[in-house]
Amino acid sequence: LAMDLGLAKERLERGDDPAGTVMLVGQAHDEAKRAITDLRELVRGIHPAVLADRGLDAALSSVAARCPIPVDLQVDLPERPPAPVEATAYFVVTEALTNVAKHSRARGARVRISRRGPMVTVEVTDDGVGGAVVQEAGGLAGLADRVRAVEGTLRLASPPGGPTTLLAELPCGS
């Protein structure tokens, strides 16, 4: 994009090759539109629209409804947490339910989100086979990084035979 615009600028300054300059500006315009689309998709991935528009309970209700196994969801928050905490809670649940559906052979999952003092607690438990581990390049490792980014903690308990529980504690002020 920058190279195309730089070349177009040079050609305009020299006054030569108007057709080529128009083509370069057109290419730069197309690249800019693609970049904007990519950024919008990235932002949605960071903070989904339903989360921003309707809050954590509605966003997670939608996630639970799409999960291939039954999910018992309880969100007990007296007020909306700060946006980074809300987004982190959302991604903890979505990653956990993805893992439950893919790996656990569970018949059901339970999600509990509550406020305990200055912390939002997110707990996802399944009745599957257990044995889950955090792998260095896996989704849970990335999730642990996301939780640490808001100064939270993430713990996994998954004994062989189950159940598996993922617990995130996310600070959100007093």
Describe every region a protein language model picked out:
Residues 1-174:
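Coiled-coil dimerization/phosphotransfer module
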